[in-house]
Design a protein with these regions (language model features):
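Ligand-binding beta-strand-loop-alpha-helix segment within the catalytic cores
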Residues: 177-206
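Contiguous, glycine/small-aliphatic-enriched amphipathic segments in soluble metabolic enzymes
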Residues: 1-160, 203-285, 289-297, 301-304, ...
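A generic local secondary-structure boundary/capping motif
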Residues: 165, 173-176, 218-219, 283
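Glycine/threonine-rich beta-strand-loop-alpha-helix active-site module
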Residues: 152-174
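Residue-level signal for secondary-structure boundary elements
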Residues: 172, 176, 347-350
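Conserved hydrophobic/aromatic beta-strand scaffold that supports enzyme active sites
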Residues: 163, 175, 184-186, 313
Length: 350
């Protein structure tokens, strides 16, 4: 029976970027492995788009198009493609004047921002978010989108993490990056550096520690995760008081709650120690503080994981790469890792 086998949905991403390319390349490499036989895969996007990228990349993948979402007909090892236009009529998903149903196209423009591409990317994401939020799929892998393009349709769009939290009604989420030897959770995400200090609050730090601790226990099967927390200022506390006022109290409170958390540590040492196995994860105060070290160690293998959602969500840690789109140059290693993690997490959580 397939009823208990988790379903993993993969969004289209911006079809003019490398999203469809890395998705299909990753699936081509993973399809013979045992892991994909433990899940049911569902690609969200027009069949014509996937077929065109299949040809561009000289792959020989076979697709099974399905007009409507029906779990009973989904089989492990098969690449099912859901017709997203028909899905809009089947599901109670609202449309707007900027995004009416009739504008969902089957063609796209390579290597540039366009409203046509944005419509396809947004339609796929909305379907994926709906399926995951309703528990109809257990895992969601999101291919890269161009945020500026999606803002043509949704002025509130900041990024995948914020969008999925909004759609699923989740108040507490965190962005964690898995680089293999190094895992990093961010306290602040997509904000200018000058606005970061205002976000370094005790409650916010405690929330990220708690989400990371719970996730490591549940999905990585680490009984007592060891979590390190970075300082905001150079050398731990020079030129600022955020450490004494916000970070230290957050760490001490979580220690009282029996969480194995340590710090704050200077950012110029802690990532090295964590990558050597001393800690299971690092809580970084801002985007580039955490991602600089992580991408140095795992530039083409890192995976973006959203903590706190009622479903598993992963994504490759790169963008649309318009400059190489359509040239069959993109490497799929990060997308492979994202799909593998989503499969493993969904199997464990199912």
């Amino acid at each position: 029976m397939t009823g208990n086998i988790p379903i993993i949905a993969i969004t289209l991403g911006d079809p003019g970027g490398i999203g469809p390319e890395v998705t299909l390349k990753a699936l081509s490499l993973l399809r013979k492995g045992a892991l994909l036989k433990q899940v049911r895969l569902l690609l969200l996007g027009p069949l014509e788009v996937y077929e065109s990228w299949n040809q561009k990349c000289k792959l020989r993948l076979a697709f099974n198009p399905i007009p409507f979402f029906e779990p009973k007909i989904l089989t492990p090892g098969i690449l099912h493609v859901l017709d997203i236009e028909k899905a809009f009529t089947a599901f109670p998903i609202s449309t707007s004047r900027r995004f009416p149903l009739k504008v969902i196209p089957s063609t796209y423009e390579i290597g540039r921002i366009s409203e046509k591409n944005a419509c396809l990317a947004y339609a796929s994401l909305r379907i994926g978010a709906y399926l995951a939020s309703c528990g109809m799929v257990q895992g969601l892998v999101t291919a890269p989108i161009h945020k500026q393009a999606l803002r043509l349709l949704d002025s509130r769009f900041v990024g995948h993490t914020e969008y999925l939290a909004r759609v699923s009604g989740t108040k507490k989420v965190a962005m964690m990056f898995d680089g293999g030897k190094l895992k990093v959770t961010l306290v602040s995400i997509h904000v200018p550096l000058r606005k970061v200090p205002a976000l370094i609050k005790q409650e916010n730090i405690q929330e990220k520690i708690d989400l990371t601790n719970r996730f490591l226990k549940k999905f990585y099967c680490i009984k007592k995760p060891r979590i390190a927390v970075t300082a905001l200022n150079p050398h731990g506390e020079e030129f600022g008081n955020e450490e004494k006022r916000e970070i230290v109290p957050a760490v001490r409170l979580m220690q009282k709650r029996k969480v194995k958390v340590f710090g704050p540590f200077s950012g110029d040492q802690i990532f090295y120690e964590a990558s050597r196995g001393k800690y299971d994860a690092v809580i970084a105060m801002y985007h580039d503080q955490g991602l600089g070290p992580l991408k140095t160690l795992a530039f083409d293998r890192a995976v973006n994981v959203t903590l706190g959602l009622p479903f598993v969500r992963t994504s490759p840690d790169h963008g649309t790469a318009f400059d190489i789109a359509g040239k069959n140059l993109a490497t799929s290693s990060s997308m492979q890792a994202a799909i593998q993690l989503a499969c493993r997490f969904s199997v464990k959580g199912n």
